[in-house]
């Protein structure tokens, strides 16, 4: 898939999530970085509930890459140390919850219970959107 096809597909997916009026529940279980995370039903795109497992990593980029960019002239030991600090301060599910990107950090064994609860809570969700003839994508 060439880059223009990928960009079109990402735009269509973003458009679909942004205009969906159904309950939107998201569970982050692993790595969720950059614009790919934003496109995949993030809180900023309109997700109603976002849960994260304790092992999730949420942020702009992976900690190792961020440390290599910020400390390009440092030795490997310093880069590893700074990557650990970055991961804790910027990419952890706790920091994502503090910023409002995640509603609750849940244990993997409780995922089913939380997702069912979210859909039960959102069962009566109604979104009033203005009438329009068509979208832009």
Predicted regions and their residues:
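Ligand-binding clefts of soluble mixed alpha/beta catalytic domains
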Residues: 4-137
